[in-house]
């Protein structure tokens, strides 16, 4: 299926009041889901902000994306320390793809070459479909078109600030083949939305070392043939295409999956 359409975000079917989105974005949301106020999770993603570094993912989120682990590690009482890989380029794009003779991991390390066009129009990985959008309306339209329904679940993370050590409290499977939309670290609002086939999304309830309870959107890749072999060996001592590999998703992102149990949007 062409990736020109996406899906919508949540975990427990709760209504959250949005406070920062423009009226046009909020009105459009209400026209699609009149019984669900715009979640604060989404309104926060729409806040314009100046770049704090030259990378397309904010530096404070890199440890979340760079924590790689096995699917069988997702169980209560499992301990995680965020950040088990060191390559910035590989953290942002764990799938290797040649680009004019230079791999993405090397290219992304060259901070002066970061741009919307470079990141959004770089080659796709194996089994990946991606598309960049610059508004919530475009994201909603694409997600609904992709899934063919407004019955969708939207999920996001809420990692605690300044906390790197967590223990798993609970794990819930959300769905397969989710559409992921990442807010990129550009001055204007830009989302990089993509779907990688043969993936499973989970919501993992975590407790930080200071007792703060959080939840982490987690994606497990069952087809890892296109993953960076150096990254996988550094983190897990495995090779691409052998075992499922999982990673956390940072706070500035959302996953969309079909909702088969309710008649409206479910936000988790």
Curated annotation (Swiss-Prot):
Entry-linked PANTHER family: ABUNDANT PROTEIN, PUTATIVE-RELATED (PTHR31236:SF35), BURP DOMAIN PROTEIN USPL1-LIKE (PTHR31236)
Sequence repeat windows: 50-55, 83-88, 101-106, 166-183, 202-222
Species this protein is from: Vicia faba
Identification of the protein by name: Embryonic abundant protein USP92
UniProt-listed InterPro entries: BURP, BURP_dom
Residues in BURP domain copies: 68-259
Cystines in this chain: none
Glycosylated residues in this chain: 259
Signal peptide: 1-22
Region spans: 3 X 6 AA approximate repeats: 50-106
Keyword Cell division: no
Tissue: Seed.
Keyword Ribonucleoprotein: no
Key words of the record: Glycoprotein, Repeat, Signal
SMART domains: BURP
Chain positions covered by the region annotation 2 X approximate repeats: 166-222
């Amino acid at each position: 299926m062409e990736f020109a359409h996406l899906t919508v975000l949540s975990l427990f079917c709760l209504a959250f009041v949005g406070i920062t989105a423009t009226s046009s974005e909020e009105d459009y949301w209400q026209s699609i889901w009149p019984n669900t106020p715009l979640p604060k999770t989404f309104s926060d993603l729409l806040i314009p902000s100046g770049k704090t570094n030259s990378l397309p993912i904010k530096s404070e989120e890199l440890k979340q994306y760079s924590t790689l682990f096995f699917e069988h590690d997702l169980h209560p009482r499992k301990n995680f320390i965020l950040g088990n890989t060191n390559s910035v380029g590989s953290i942002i794009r764990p799938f290797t793809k040649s680009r004019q003779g230079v791999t993405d991991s090397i290219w992304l390390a060259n901070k002066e070459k970061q741009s919307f066009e470079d990141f959004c129009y770089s080659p796709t990985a194996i089994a990946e479909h991606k598309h960049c959008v610059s508004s919530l309306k475009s994201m909603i339209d694409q997600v609904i078109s992709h899934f063919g329904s407004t019955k969708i679940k939207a999920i996001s993370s809420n990692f605690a600030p300044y906390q790197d050590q967590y223990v798993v409290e609970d794990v819930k499977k959300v769905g397969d083949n989710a559409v992921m939309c990442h807010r990129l670290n550009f001055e204007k609002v830009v989302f990089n939305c993509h779907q990688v086939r043969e993936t499973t999304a989970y919501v993992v309830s975590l407790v930080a070392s200071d007792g703060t309870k959080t939840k982490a959107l987690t994606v497990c890749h069952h087809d890892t043939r296109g993953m960076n072999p150096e990254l996988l060996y550094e983190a897990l001592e495995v090779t691409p295409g052998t075992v499922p590999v999982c990673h956390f998703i940072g706070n500035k992102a959302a996953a969309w999956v079909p909702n088969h149990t309710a008649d409206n949007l479910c936000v988790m």
